[in-house]
Amino acid sequence: MAIRVTVWNENRHEKTDERVRKVYPEGIHGALASILQSQGMEVKTATLDEPEHGLTDAVLENTDVLVWWGHLAHNEVSDVVVEKVYQRVLDGMGLIVLHSAHFSKIFRKLMGTSCDLKWREIGEKERLWVVEPGHPIVEGIGEYIELPQTEMYGERFDIPAPDTLVFISWFAGGVKSIRILILFKYMFY
């Protein structure tokens, strides 16, 4: 049976920034969905402006993994929807948060912390080191992945200690690395 994934995106940049719209004509959620579908996953998308933000009870009940992309509209997410997602995660649904979703209501509720971290945007190189090479999520990856130009997210990242640390990252501009992929007992991998 295929993994059932729902990709959620606030879908704000695509509506307000022509450059983003050109890169992601189907939205960031559409680009992510396409990649996951190419890997044999059953994928649907949901966005902030849909009723219930596209995360109805039926959608959540038929989701094994929820991918959450957020950046600037965290406070627009309904507390009712956050509570539904929270309960589904506690019941076993996986959650993967991307980009600035570390400040999303759902991630902060799950972590029980501020989820604050250091950040800068100077277009520097990042190297993501695999620190748990036997973990299934890094199957087929060498010692590291290198991104030639990215934003820096750095420690201290105010989250609880993870059950498993799979990647740490290093940035060309200095500053401490950040724990990139953290897996807690209720997160999917």
Task: Tell what function each PLM region has.
Residues 2-15:
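Short beta-strand segments enriched in small/hydrophobic residues
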Residues 73-143:
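A glycine-rich, often tryptophan-bearing local segment used as a flexible ligand/cofactor-contacting loop or short
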Residues 17-20, 108-110, 179:
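Short aromatic-enriched loop/helix-cap "lid" or pocket-rim segments at secondary-structure transitions
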Residues 9, 70, 118:
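Residues that line or immediately flank small-molecule/substrate-binding pockets and catalytic motifs
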Residues 120-189:
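Catalytic beta-strand/loop cores that center a nucleophilic Ser/Cys/Thr
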Residues 13-17, 175-176:
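Short, solvent-exposed loop/turn elements at domain surfaces
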Residues 8, 46-49, 167-170:
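Conserved beta-strand termini and adjacent loop/short-helix elements that scaffold enzyme active sites
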Residues 21, 25-104:
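Helical hinge/lid and interdomain linker segments adjacent to catalytic or ligand-binding clefts
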